[in-house]
From Swiss-Prot:
It comes from the Bacteria. One of its GO terms (cellular component) is plasma membrane. This is Aromatic amino acid transport protein AroP. The gene is aroP. Belongs to the amino acid-polyamine-organocation (APC) superfamily. Amino acid transporter (AAT) (TC 2.A.3.1) family. It is found in: Cell membrane. The keyword Ubl conjugation does not apply. InterPro entries: AA-permease/SLC12A_dom (IPR004841), Amino_acid_permease_CS (IPR004840).
Length: 463
């Protein structure tokens, strides 16, 4: 199938997509949240990361197969519609848009709190400046977004590699003042699995969503000059990112720190990354990690403005959103869609400070389960579309392994994750909240199918 980006630009290069593939999931969740999983499972959190990582690798391989065959700015929303019709594309697109909008607010609030403390100003000031700045970056041309994400990702990858090198040197006692630690912390008095299988299950719930946002690379690929090559490289990078960056970081932390001394971090000073850099007598570690955390949050925010605008643009072209959002500027940027993302970024940030009757709690709970729905629908879409893609000779650079068995295994693993969430009092509300939100969107898709928004066409007309 010929490349189709619906009139968008082609300013992204393979290097942009490859670096995005490496760095897109290296965020504040890794630097601040890793300790939550370690505290729950001890060193056995590695098993939780392996299980969660396997799910993500399989999902991305399936998504990569469809994206390489049919590059589209709507990505999995478009493939859901191709596979199951209007209801799937509509509900999946708006669900992911909702998820990113809510996460945008939380991330900007976190970054603004740190920057406000730096400059001695109210957090809303850096928040306003950053939202406007990244909106402008995304309004000018897609190349600007790509360059920012390239360098954001480059810095994050460089920091993780430096952390791994320093950590290994500390483990083997190669740095001044350090001694060989062996497995005294990794095994210690409590063993590899101090809290048993239940601890690993709790750890899995803590780390399962650490890889969220990885799907954005397939949205961006539609604006690449070589989408199939870019998608192939980005999908392959997923395995390296999980095995080296996540598993490597957790190995270093669990070898150097007793698991019972590790907790989830609310500040950079509490991050296990900061504490390990301090072991190496590196000065200014707290300030350095604060800067890296801010960079990670702003990188995610920039990517989410981009992804939400392209999703709305794609849905507008498919008549699942008002047509005004399909308008392109002379530089092939969906200006109105970017402005919509900017507006809701302000709304989402505002909700972080003004929480009417628990609305924010409900919305953020729904976000926790959105990824499971998205990953499940990606899997179902690939299982449904594979025969059609083969018949049309569309499968090219990326092919799902052991089809359909690994796809079925992915669904089983996702079902198991849902079962764990239902069995956990803290996670149960996430399942209920996303079920309400997604059910509402599915119903809305049937209500709007013959609305003026779609020009009175039926799904079969659109196909």
């Amino acid at each position: 199938m010929a490349k189709s980006n619906e009139g968008l630009g082609t300013g992204l290069r393979t290097r942009h997509l490859t670096m995005m593939g490496l760095g897109s999931a290296i965020g504040a969740g890794l630097f601040l949240g890793t300790g939550v999983g370690i505290r729950a499972a001890g060193p056995a959190v590695l098993l939780a990361y392996i299980i969660a990582g396997a799910i993500v690798v399989l999902v991305m391989q399936m998504l990569g197969e469809m994206a390489a065959a049919r590059p589209a700015s709507g990505s999995f929303s478009r493939y859901g519609e191709d596979a199951f019709g209007h209801w799937a594309g509509f509900s999946l697109g708006w669900l992911y848009w909702f998820m990113l909008i809510m996460v945008m607010g939380a991330e900007m609030t976190g970054a603004a709190a740190i920057m406000g403390a730096w400059f001695g100003v109210e957090p809303w000031i850096p928040s306003l400046v950053c939202v406007v700045f990244f909106a402008v970056v995304n309004l000018v041309a897609v190349r600007g977004f790509g360059e920012f994400e390239y360098w954001f990702a480059f810095i994050k990858v460089a920091v993780i590699i430096a952390f791994l090198i320093i950590g290994i040197a500390l483990i083997f006692g190669w740095l001044p003042g350090s001694t060989f630690v062996g497995t005294s912390n990794f095994i210690g008095d409590h063993g590899f699995m101090p809290n048993g299988i239940s601890g690993v299950a709790a750890g899995l719930l803590a780390v399962a969503f650490a890889f969220g946002g990885i799907e954005i690379v397939t949205i961006a690929a539609a604006e690449s000059d070589k989408p199939r090559e870019a998608i192939s490289l980005a999908v392959r990078a997923v395995i390296w990112r999980i095995s080296v960056f996540y598993l490597g970081s957790v190995l270093v932390i669990t070898f150097l720190m007793p698991y019972e001394s590790i907790n989830g971090a609310d500040t950079a000073a509490e991050s296990p990354f900061t504490q390990i850099l301090a072991m190496a007598n590196i000065p200014g570690t707290v300030g350095f990690m604060e800067a890296i955390i801010v960079l990670a949050l702003l990188s995610a925010f920039n990517a989410q403005i981009y992804a939400t605008s392209r999703l709305v643009f794609s849905m507008a072209n498919r008549q699942d959103a008002p047509r005004v959002f399909s308008k392109l500027s002379t530089s092939h940027v969906p200006t109105n869609a970017v402005l919509l993302s900017m507006f809701f970024a302000f709304v989402s940030v505002g909700l972080q400070y003004w929480n009417p009757a628990g609305l924010l709690d409900f919305l953020l709970n729904a976000v926790g389960g959105c990824l499971i729905v998205v990953w499940a629908m990606i899997t179902l879409s690939q299982l449904k579309l594979r025969k059609e893609l083969q018949a049309n000779d569309e499968i090219s650079t990326v092919r799902m392994w052991a089809h359909p068995w690994l796809g079925i295994l992915t669904l089983v693993l996702l079902a198991g994750l849902v079962a764990l969430m239902l069995g956990d009092a803290a996670s149960r509300s996430q399942v209920y909240s996303v079920a309400i939100v997604y059910g509402f969107l599915v119903l809305l898709s049937f209500v709007t199918v013959n609305s003026p928004l779609r020009g009175g066409r039926t799904p079969s007309d659109l196909n």
